[in-house]
Amino acid sequence: MPSSDVQSYATLREDLAKRDRSLREKVVSLEEAAGLVRDGMQVGIGGSTMSRTPMALIWELIRQGRKQLSCSRCIVSTDGDLLFGGGVADEIVTSWFAQGILWGLSKVMRHHVEAGDKRYQEWSHLAMGMRFRAGGMGVPFLPIRSMLGSDLMPLRPEAKEFDCPFTGEKLLLVPALNPDVAIIHVQRCDAYGNAQIDGLQFMDIDLALAANSVILTTERIVSNDQIRRMPDHTKIPFMCVDAVVEVPYGAAPHECYGLYEPMMKHMEAYVAQVNADPVEGMKAYLDRFVYGPKNWTEFLSLIGMEEIVEASRQGRSMYND
Amino acid sequence: MPSSDVQSYATLREDLAKRDRSLREKVVSLEEAAGLVRDGMQVGIGGSTMSRTPMALIWELIRQGRKQLSCSRCIVSTDGDLLFGGGVADEIVTSWFAQGILWGLSKVMRHHVEAGDKRYQEWSHLAMGMRFRAGGMGVPFLPIRSMLGSDLMPLRPEAKEFDCPFTGEKLLLVPALNPDVAIIHVQRCDAYGNAQIDGLQFMDIDLALAANSVILTTERIVSNDQIRRMPDHTKIPFMCVDAVVEVPYGAAPHECYGLYEPMMKHMEAYVAQVNADPVEGMKAYLDRFVYGPKNWTEFLSLIGMEEIVEASRQGRSMYND
Amino acid sequence: MTSSNRYTASEILTVLSARALENGQLVFAGIGIPLLAATLAQRLGRPGLTILFEGGVIGAFVEPGKLPPSTNDQRCTKRANMVLGSADVLLLLQRGYVDIGFMGGAQIDQYGNLNSSFIGDPDAPKVRLPGSGGGNDISSLTNMIVAMKHEKRRFVEQVDFITSPGYLRGQNSRTDAGLPAGGVFRVITELAVFGFDAETRRIKVLSLNPGVTAEEVQDNTGFPLTFDDGVTVTEPPTNEELETLRMLDPERLFTA
Amino acid sequence: MTSSNRYTASEILTVLSARALENGQLVFAGIGIPLLAATLAQRLGRPGLTILFEGGVIGAFVEPGKLPPSTNDQRCTKRANMVLGSADVLLLLQRGYVDIGFMGGAQIDQYGNLNSSFIGDPDAPKVRLPGSGGGNDISSLTNMIVAMKHEKRRFVEQVDFITSPGYLRGQNSRTDAGLPAGGVFRVITELAVFGFDAETRRIKVLSLNPGVTAEEVQDNTGFPLTFDDGVTVTEPPTNEELETLRMLDPERLFTA
């Protein structure tokens, strides 16, 4: 199905009714979790920019040679580079796609999009949020007051301009987005998938509710008892979740709130390499850092202990008074 | 303005632009806070049923003789009795209005509504939630999939049946509700109005964002430093808030999550008295418990130390392991 | 069998309701019998039953002797997996995450429509009832079980007012009204258990409670009843069921 | 005055931007100069300035030397009053809670429209730029200040693509398109400060930066400029402004 089509309520309900939503343990390996993402799927990605990006799972998808994904995320940075450059995504649906303010445009994105072999489907940030939210609410659209008048509106005929029957005002109705699968990285969750997210939550709660399946990667798996002691700290409920993978430093080299900041030396070297040559530079990066390591921990050791410790020190300093 | 009319965006924005939303101290007395609610206003009430009801403020509104309010709340219990019986509200907009499952129908509500001197405007619970949410989002409506087909739909022509331009499905568009003022009781907030809510939050966040002014009553005023140490625990941001009142046991005889459960002996005596005679029984209750005491603490002493201690013991036991 | 004379109408209603719930299901429970029955099911070997409450709760374990006075009280959140906004928990129904909605009823008709708003003319009601609460939403969005007292004035051919839709006027009228999902599939009373005809969507008796005759059920119903071809007789409450129930509600708050 | 030769283009841009912000305002700041300028304003005697970030932050105090690499990083939340969802912080703009949106710009035109999506034909772009992010939402929903480098290729008569609406085609075209609230009211560059004509909605020079001539501004602009009747000359950055700025960004992350 084209990534901008709205699913009928009957389809949404049928797909959800088929899922095993019961309270059950869902812990799997990173390899098994990546196997739940199949070629051609629409994949919603949690976090934003360089924060709580489910990098380990993206890394594993590239290693497994997944193809023709349509990936959606509120804001995309080097994860988008890897999705395009690693050959797994044909389309990225987002509001912003660059390597970050420190490095400017993504040469990798430019290379693929300007050549026309990959697509970047652009929405406003609020529109992305309301698309996930509509999906999570089980309604086909939500109304917003932005994108109107701009050239983004004609670029996205999937959204519909609309005269409000209450006030006569112009509004834009943005279509629900219900990805086939969402991949989200969290600080901690239990074996059932009840997840706590510290600090910035971005659009992850709406995304988890909207998607037709959810894979959580987590820094730590905690007991269900610990979750039940503070039920108002649970951000994603277990029945949305289909798989749980414990991956310490699973957002590296991006950050995970309160635990580690981005590993900037690795990022800077990456950017220099792929911007110098978005094809060969990317290939060399993938060979060394994605296809090369035996497992995620070996990837971390390529980033290096010094970077990991420094990023952790910075990350934990959030809680300094 | 009739309570079901949707405000134009221009009006909403103008009203909000006039408010002083800056970071400033807003601590006032209960008497002063009640003075911000003026006759004829639409008043949104936080909490639900017997939980975190802003009872002290409602009590003070009755004492000050406020009139002709239209009050909205997700679910109404004995607070609704007092609003009708105390003469302050002419209309209550809610999804459910009774004294509670333990006592059944509200004879006070029945007396006033069946006689036609007061109005109970009924919506489904989800519709109430989406009305506040639309108000908080700055959109004139939200779509829902309930109320359709029932007799609630023709009862509420303020909502509009609608054919979805994306899927062709029938939906109901429920109109935004932007109360003139919201009154919300919380466990703690700072002097600026940054509020933390423990446990059940009901519709309070949407309500706070939707209303054109917000009065917080709080069990405790904490320092802004304490708020800033855990910014992801703030549920209502200061710029929504116009007044802060510290009122320990401000939801009595209802409950406040983690602090005290309902004061059941007082509630049972109340119910017996007003159900025996919704007019004279209510008058006697008001004379003794609302008009009689010098201040809120004296009202608490009429409830009695034994009840307060027992309710607190039960309330705090939520955190027993 | 030996306990047949030793339970109240509310007790058999609760026990039979608990039996209708399966381990692993997600059940959105209303206050009263539904809350109690779902809690009973958890205690009777179905700990993986997840109870949702309208106040904004997922996966609570209510404590024995501490039944909440509404589904919006803190007691509903004890050892829950998650607490969230009350509109948000209802949106889970709309999205389709919940297996079963489970409510009490004041008045029901032959198509499973429920009235909790008005007795008499809505413009000048004889009795103004409490209203929908989440009832309309639950019945609009989810497969539903109703547990209620069996009285002639409560089981009527057509309710005065449809607060919470069953199958509206039968056949496809529910789907045509914009409600393609869910619908009431069981009604449980102290006399019998009911289902609905797959085509006409009219109520029918599936099984009789122990010691209850078909005639007795009909006599307490305000319209002519259909009986399923294979009407069975329900097993009476066991001692374990009754004892566990009485442990949960020692003050008979919901089972008086 | 003595410091006039001792600041970079980015520095005067940041200092003038900080001056445009008042104590007590709620400012939604983008990454780069806006974040830095708003933080500078807080440190220069306006501690009651509330900064909002797109990542979902209200009222942050960014620490000196710890500038975040985006507005979605944890550094943006340091000592914030509230952290919330990123769609929810944008909805605060839609509802009207925010006084000022404050963004950088890649390309602007005479009506204050911004392009951050495409250079050349959108169907076959010469350069695919990063896109809107929250830019379209901020400029659609809020009164806005834009801070940007002044170059001829960035100040054009008509942008290739309107990512973030200014006054569209001038006059009432913005309101007519469904955007009755907000609009860009200041553009700040290293050469001058601009406003917009109340009727035509076309950009005009309000004041020249110290040492800059009107001719110089025109030479660096891709269309004929209007100068306000009372064009003034801006006071140069003070030592306090520059020193505080350099304390905040010691590595010249945003002020190189």
Residue ranges, per PLM feature:
Chain A
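Conserved alpha/beta enzyme-core scaffold
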Residues: 1-321
